């Protein structure tokens, strides 16, 4: 999905998060056109300590950046998966049903906002909630990720057995 219509609002929301966290912000592009979105966000927020990870990172490098973060403001499903696997608390801006379904499986729906309701004020309130519940979220994410990881491995084994039967 192209988020160019939301860029100015995203920038305002990122500034709100930056004011709360008082930490450098790193934008991790997970699809090719996200890099240009990151550049536009940086242009809109020249006063922020906002960095853009290289656009050609592999999945492992992206996961390592997220793993070493204290908080994720996430939109893309893969960034949410990386944060969940590493126990990094996050607030999700929901743009697609697949993201909603992932949050349900993680029991993290309360830490999300539908894209059409995203405002700096709403983001501030949700970030406060995530920060207040940080320890519980870390415990929850680690537990849910372990369960979902086992389900993924079982599914993989089923697919591999079906493929090997047809060969």
What positions do the PLM features span?
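Active-site anion-handling motifs in enzyme catalytic cores
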Residues: 1-167
């Amino acid at each position: 999905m192209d988020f160019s219509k939301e860029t100015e609002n995203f920038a305002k929301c990122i500034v709100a998060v930056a004011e709360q966290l008082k930490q450098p912000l790193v934008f991790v592009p997970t699809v090719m056109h996200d890099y240009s979105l990151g550049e536009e966000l940086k242009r809109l927020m020249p006063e922020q300590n906002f960095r853009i990870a290289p656009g050609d990172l592999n999945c492992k490098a992206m996961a390592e950046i997220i793993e070493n973060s204290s908080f994720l403001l996430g939109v893309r499903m893969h960034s949410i998966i990386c944060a969940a696997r590493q126990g990094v608390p996050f607030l999700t801006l929901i743009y697609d049903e697949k993201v909603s379904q992932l949050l349900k499986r993680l029991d993290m729906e309360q830490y999300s906002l539908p894209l059409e309701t995203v405002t700096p004020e709403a983001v501030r309130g949700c970030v406060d909630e995530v920060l207040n519940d940080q320890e519980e979220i870390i415990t929850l994410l680690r537990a849910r990720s372990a369960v979902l990881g086992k389900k993924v491995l079982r599914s993989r084994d089923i697919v591999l057995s079906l493929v090997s039967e047809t060969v």
